[in-house]
Amino acid sequence: MTIKIILGEHQITRTELLGGIVIVSGCGAVAYCISKFWGYGAIAPYPQSGGNRVTRALQRAVIDKTKTPIKTHFYPLDSLRTVTPRRASDNGHAVSGAVRDAARRLINESIETVGGSKFELNPNPNSTMGPRNHFHFAVGDLAQNFRDDQPAADAFIVGVDVDYYITEPDVLLEHMRPLVLHTFNPKKVSGFDADSPFTINNNLVEYKVSGGAAWVHPVWDWCEAGEFIASRVRSSWFEWLLQLPLRCLGLERVGYHKIHHCRPWTDCPDRALVYTIPQHTVWRFTWIDTEIHTRKLKRITYQDNTKPGWNRLEHVSDNNQLLVSIGREGEHMQITIEKDKLEMLSGLGATQSVNARLIGMGHKDPLYTSMIVQYYTGKKVVLSVAPTVYRPTMPRVHWPVTSDADVPEVSARQYTKPIISDCMMMPMIKRWETMSESIERRVTFVANNKKPSDAVAKIAAEFVSLMNGPFIDLEPLTIEETVERLNKPSQQLQLRAVFEIMGVEPRQVIESFNKNEPGMKSSRIISAFPDILFIVKVSRYTLAYSDAVLHAEHNQHWYYPGRTPVGITDGVCEFVSDCDGQVIETDFSNLDGRVSGWMQRNIAQKAMVQAFRAEYRDEIISFMDTIINCPAKAKRFGFRYEPGMGVKSGSPTTTPHNTQYNACVEYTALKFEYPDANPEDLFSLLGPKCGDDGLARATIQKTINRAAKCYGLELKVEKYNPEVGLCFLSRVFVDPLNTPTTIQDPLRTLRKLHITTRDPTIPIADAACDRVEGYLCTDAHTPLISEYCRMVQRLYGPKTSTRDVREARRSRNKEKPYWLTCDGSWPQHPQDALLMKQIVVSRTGIDEDTVDKLIGRFAAMKDVWEPITLESEESKAAQTIDEEGVAPGSVDESLLKLNDAKQTRSNSGTSGPHTKGGGSGTGNELPRSTKQRAKGPRQSAGLPKQGKANSKPNGNVAAGQAQHGGIPRGKTPSGGKTNARRAPPKAGAQPGAPTNPK
């Protein structure tokens, strides 16, 4: 086929035409590419890379055509909840530790909110157990296994106080994932990071932690100016092989990251939160200069190149001033001055001129001016090497979830580090939120209005009749006899003040306060009756009733208050022997708060009304009305609250009445188990009782809980296990069938043995030795406890005051065991040492090898602050915010009620204690029950204060209140063995008659 050309007769073929078109198009394309490529070599309107135009165009073209954006949305400060985090306990570095914990929580939450996963570098066990890079460099790293995982596609790489030890940042950045760091990046050359001192020597930070370790490391310049950094990009082996031809041409793949930093922690301005966001990856020639400007991360050089021996660091302040921190290498002294002033001073010709200019600028502090002059002259000094004693740790603090406290506020002290990490906590008794929460948890939430059935009420009446026995015409003690029996120092002081008005009707009011003692949950409340006249009035009857009835022969087998330690151990061993070891431990949950008004009326009140002569009944009913329905207020803070009908812990009736309620529950269980038995025979089967502690026969293990519920009470039952011993009155009987040896409950004791609540003005050595001396009297052979006490005595002994000075203090016995103040001690036989160790191992969960190592550690210690703490696998702390956050179970449906009560009781503008006594009714008061108040005149709510000795927060004065805080002294019961009387009846049959009928 031919094509005719209009401009001539020449003809061409189609093939020739298509070939021509291809040639023309190719030439055009080449021309276009050349023009575009040549365009990459254009001269920019700002500085450009060196080299010729061809290489410059080649580099620009490769970067432009290979750039790959990486889209990541991440802003961690959206998860910032507080800038002043606080810890519940002071471990020597509470503030810096709280900031680290808060940073960890912030990082975790911010990652979770964007759906990412966490990949952490050398985390602690409480942080993560997931994918991580974990090498063993520090002792703490051994808590987790060695791992070298790779970050996932959605991973955020996290480092908390570890980036200093990285050899090069590219090992973290090459994954092209966000990097989040909590790091130390100081703005001054020495000083304190919150509560931990640091210095800088040879460009290395020397950071020493009170209650922790010492660290030496350089610092990366994350916070330097320049927002973009470059890194290599990690490739798999397969990708690396595919890219090998490109690498042979001199190409490399790099990534660009945007770097951010902030300093959100008010108390730790030298701590920074650093995070990088990957932006792009590109290919580029290594042999051609790049025009993309980034900064290179490097170690910070603190040394001043113009002043050898000095460090210098500049930073911009919050009000946009350029400041300079200067100080000698390795020294703690540093000063901060405006840079323009320092530059001006550096140009002066004489030191006198420097001083004159500083004074003229308003700097008159000799310390400040001297430091500037020394820097001006470049004066160097030889560093002294001396040991440093760092601040001791403070007790672990119970921190209610509703508390508004900023810092822990406790007066208790530690004299060694805790023996076990899950130690007891001290309540913040100066905080009104602590009082409010204790009221809710120990009074309001457990209030009991349950009325038993007719059958159970009949059993209770039967118990009262058996308990009273033949006594129907008792006489109360005289006032003189009662005053003689009230021998506590605080009571004697009050009695002398009111002796002339002894016949006046006492005031009806309760002033409560938190007991300053360590515990694992909300602190106990002491509901005290401040009017000593009321104590005298009640004690006339309670003491007479205890002497005549409760210590009578027919009650001595179960009523244990008033017995000596030897009498208690003999009675317990006899009871366990009678039962052939088939016994159970009973322990009521919050018996004081859960006792109902019905129980108090129909057991305790009924017993006394029937035992005393008729003319005393009105007075008995009167003081029982007061105990059950008396109005109450917080002694320290002044707010009123509804105290409920429970037992009031500051009343003389507390221990004897609680013991009666305890025995009544067991008697009810015996009636359930043996419904056809003789009442007198069942009564003789009651086990030892003292307050809410008790022992009972194992035959009623299934019925005693049912009996407790009939009265609205909660009871915990444990069957005696020879491997863990038998616990009664916080003493563990190691083998009651064969030996009377007892030991302190080891776990409970080890949790609090390192704490003293003595007045802080008393030297710590005196307080420590006074405390451990008591344990060495009662537990001289108890493993761990005795060795620990001897260690404290050995190391603190040379530092104590003289024996006369220590004995002269009124609080000398404040922390002595109750039994020691009563001239009694628990029996311990040295030959039972192996058995005692086995019980300690079983009850604490600490294996025998660890116990032996710890005992050896105590013997070898040279300093009381050496680390001895054993890590607990789990915490038993409750109703608190602990070191790692809110303790499990502390936030539940009760939180709203706690907050409501807190708001109701709060005072406008303050949460601290009142400076004045309680005033008249205010809008802050809670409604009070008035239907069942005792009859008679009521005084105004504006009550006069009692004697100052009763209310001073002074350990020496308050000691009298705690010297006999346990079981009241009384008449020691006597009598012969009761084995035959206690023989258990056969099931379904009537028990045999006792051999010694009463």
UniProtKB/Swiss-Prot annotation:
Q: Which keywords does UniProt give here?
A: Host membrane, Host mitochondrion, Host mitochondrion outer membrane, Membrane, Nucleotidyltransferase, RNA-directed RNA polymerase, Transferase, Transmembrane, Transmembrane helix
Q: Does the keyword Transmembrane apply?
A: yes
TM stretches of this protein: 21-43
Q: How does it sit in the membrane?
A: Single-pass membrane protein
Q: Which GO terms describe its molecular function?
A: RNA-directed RNA polymerase activity
The UniProt record lists the EC number as: 2.7.7.48
UniProt keyword Transmembrane, yes or no: yes
Compartments (UniProt record): Host mitochondrion outer membrane
Q: Which cellular component appears as one GO term in the record?
A: host cell mitochondrial outer membrane
User: Region (Capping) spans which residues?
Assistant: 91-282
* Obligatory cofactor(s): Mn(2+)
Cofactor binding description: For RdRP activity.
- Record function comment: RNA-dependent RNA polymerase, which replicates the viral genome composed of 2 RNA segments, RNA1 and RNA2. Does not need an exogenous primer. Also possesses a terminal nucleotidyl transferase (TNTase) activity. The TNTase catalyzes the addition of nucleotide to the 3'-end of plus- and minus-stranded RNAs, probably to repair the 3'-end nucleotide loss. Forms the open necked connection to the cytosol of the virus-induced replication vesicles. Mediates viral RNA1 recruitment.
User: What is annotated about its quaternary structure and interactions?
Assistant: Homododecamer. Forms 2 stacked rings of 35-nm in diameter, arranged in a crown-like structure at the opening of virus-induced replication vesicles. Interacts with protein B2.
Other noteworthy facts = The viral bipartite genome is composed of RNA1 and RNA2.
The similarity annotation says:
Belongs to the nodaviridae RNA polymerase family.
Q: What is this protein called?
A: RNA-directed RNA polymerase
Organism classification:
Viruses, Riboviria, Orthornavirae, Kitrinoviricota, Magsaviricetes
